[in-house]
């Protein structure tokens, strides 16, 4: 597949799963079972997630995405019970596309911002 076709697969994945909250076609888009589970678990924990694709770049089989997102913690997430607290954060992700499906992934969220916002960790102010 071309870089543009790979970008289209990743854009569709992000738009359908994280923006439209519809994972009914996830098996068409993702061959990696871990990513399918993580994506569906994330949407269940944060069902009102709002996500904006800020940048989408592709070279060969690799597609890079930069997003901004906000959501309310309404379901269990990584063992943390719902807090009802809202967070805003950014993420960058790299996806490998093989045979028209996402086969591997590397995602970097601003986990500290998210965990502080939902109350999973205490905010620590820098010492002076």
Language-model features: locations:
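C-terminal and inter-domain tail/linker signature
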Residues: 1-128
């Amino acid at each position: 597949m071309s870089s543009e076709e790979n970008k289209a697969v990743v854009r569709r994945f992000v738009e359908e799963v994280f923006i439209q909250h519809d994972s009914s076609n996830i098996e068409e888009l993702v061959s990696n079972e871990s990513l399918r589970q993580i994506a569906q678990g994330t949407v269940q924990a944060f069902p009102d997630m709002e996500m904006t694709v800020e940048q989408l770049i592709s070279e060969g089989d690799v597609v890079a995405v930069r997003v901004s997102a906000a959501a309310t913690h309404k379901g269990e997430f990584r063992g943390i019970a719902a807090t009802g607290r809202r967070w805003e954060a950014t993420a960058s992700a790299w996806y490998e596309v093989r045979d028209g499906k996402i086969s591997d992934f590397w995602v970097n969220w601003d986990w500290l911002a998210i965990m502080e916002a939902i109350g999973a960790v205490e905010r620590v102010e820098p010492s002076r």
